[in-house]
Structure formats: C-alpha cells, structure tokens
Amino acid sequence: MLNEEKSRNSGTNDLLFDFTVDKAKKMVYITREFDAEQSLVWDAFTKAELIDQWIAPHPMIAKTKYQDFKVGGKRFYAMISTDGMERWAIQEYTSITPKTNFKMFNVFADKDENPEPHGSDWDHNFSEQNGITTVNISIYNESLERMEKILEGFTIGMKMSLSNLENLLATLSKK
C-alpha cells in the first residue's frame, strides 16, 4: 500500500505488536497483545492512576490533572520531560462499552485547557482469548500535516509506552 509504514515485532515472548501508518487515509493502526486478563488491560487504559504509570515514554512522566471516564467526560493530562517542560492534552470520551471498547477525541492543549485546532479520533477495542488480551487501536487524524509532524516521535513513544504497559501488567498480574 502506498504511503504505508508497517512494523511488526514479536519480541521474545511471541506477543503480537503491529503498528501500521496509512498516510493516504490519515490513519494509524496499532494491534498489541498482552499476557494479562482483559479486565486488567481495560483498567490500565481507563484509570488515570494506572495510565500515568505507563503512558509516558521513558524518561518522561505523565500527570493527570483530572479524569472523568464517562461519555462526554474528559481526561486532562501532561507529559512532563526531565527538564520540567509540560505538554498538555485533552481526551474527550465519545463512546464507552465497558471492558470491550472506548472512543475518544485527543487534542493537544495549553496548561489552561485551550485546545489546538486539530486533534485525532481514537477507537480502542479489547478482546481476550486464552488469557491473552488483544488491544486494537485505530487513530484518525483530522490533519495530515499534524499527523506527519508528530509521527516520528509518536511511533517511538507509543512503542515505548506499550512496553511500559507490558511491564506494569506483568507486575499487577504477578505472572
């Protein structure tokens, strides 16, 4: 497919990790398997106290100012670099089907919650088979220019974040 970047990494534990970029459609597709129960993976994606433990790529940290996980609710958070620079964002939840799917609109913002002009729509799907939970994430970017601007850092950062999540889930699962 033209304008597509694809990365597949099975790692040492043979869990699927697929990251595909389709610039023509302004889409990013991520499929990642975790050796953890679906309810735990769901919690890791939907509870601020868990999200903040894995979402920021090292050495950054994440700090949620507030979260209201319901349709129409928001999470307002920052990624903080080692020099203290904060990059704020808003996630507005647009659809929630407990334990299996949630959708949100994500947009960068300033510290006062004033959003930038363009954001992205995220669709998270969760399923479990034989103790392995698969998370499928589809991300539609409103602006190709925005997508291309953040893509390199996003790709590296998301891979690091999902690796952090794998480690957190292993600790929480005691596997």
Task: List each model region and its residues.
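A conserved amphipathic terminal alpha-helix motif
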Residues: 1-13, 141-175
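Hydrophobic ligand-binding cavity/cleft-lining segments
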Residues: 2-61
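Beta-strand/loop substructures that line and gate deep hydrophobic ligand-binding cavities in soluble
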Residues: 3, 25-27, 105, 109-156
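Short Pro/Gly-enriched beta-strand edge/turn motifs at strand-loop
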Residues: 14, 47-48, 72-76, 104-109
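Short beta-edge strand/loop motif at the mouth of beta-sheet-based domains
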Residues: 29-30, 49-86
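Hydrophobic/aromatic beta-strand elements that line small-molecule binding cavities or substrate pockets
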Residues: 32, 64-67, 89-95, 120-127
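A short, structured loop/turn motif at beta-sheet edges
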Residues: 38-40, 68-70, 94-101, 125-134
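Hydrophobic pocket/interface hotspot
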Residues: 41-42, 51, 75, 93, ...
